[in-house]
Amino acid sequence: MSSAIERKSLDPSEEPVDEVLQIPPSLLTCGGCQQNIGDRYFLKAIDQYWHEDCLSCDLCGCRLGEVGRRLYYKLGRKLCRRDYLRLFGQDGLCASCDKRIRAYEMTMRVKDKVYHLECFKCAACQKHFCVGDRYLLINSDIVCEQDIYEWTKINGII
C-alpha cells in the first residue's frame, strides 16, 4: 500500500508545505525515536509525526522524506519503492533476451512485451532507441524505421 508523505511546518509564514499546524511542538512525538519534535519542519505519514531523519526505509535505511519519494507500508514495515517491489512485486521475462526482469528494474513496454532498457534496440542494426524514434514490433523483435524493409525481406515476412 502506497502512502503519501506530508511535509508540515509550525511556522505559518513558510511556503510551500502541505499544512501549517497550530499544535505546540511539545505535544508532537516522533513515530521513530519517540522524542519530542521541536524542529521547524517535520513529516506526517502512517498517522504519525516524524523527524525528517527518522522516517526511513526499514530495509535499506534510505530517507523517505526526500522530495519525490513514496512510502510503502505493508506488514508493519515502512519501505521505499525499490524494496517494496523487491519484496512484493512480480518479476517477469524480457521479450528480447528471455532473462529475468526484476520488479524494481526500469523497463520499456510495447503492447504486451516488456524489455530491459539495454535490450530495447533495433534487432537489425542494434541501435538503441531514443524518445521519438519510430520502430515496428515484429513478433518480439523491434526494428527501427530505417531497417524495416530489409528486416522483413530477410526474415521472409514480405
Curated annotation (Swiss-Prot):
Acts with TAL1/SCL to regulate red blood cell development. Also acts with LDB1 to maintain erythroid precursors in an immature state. The second LIM zinc-binding domain interacts with KDM5A. It comes from Mus musculus. SMART domains: LIM. Its main location: nucleus. Expressed in early mouse development in central nervous system, lung, kidney, liver and spleen but only very low levels occur in thymus. The keyword Oxidoreductase does not apply. PROSITE patterns: LIM_DOMAIN_1, LIM_DOMAIN_2. This is Rhombotin-2. The lineage of its organism: Eukaryota, Metazoa, Chordata, Craniata, Vertebrata. GO terms for cellular component: nucleus; protein-containing complex.
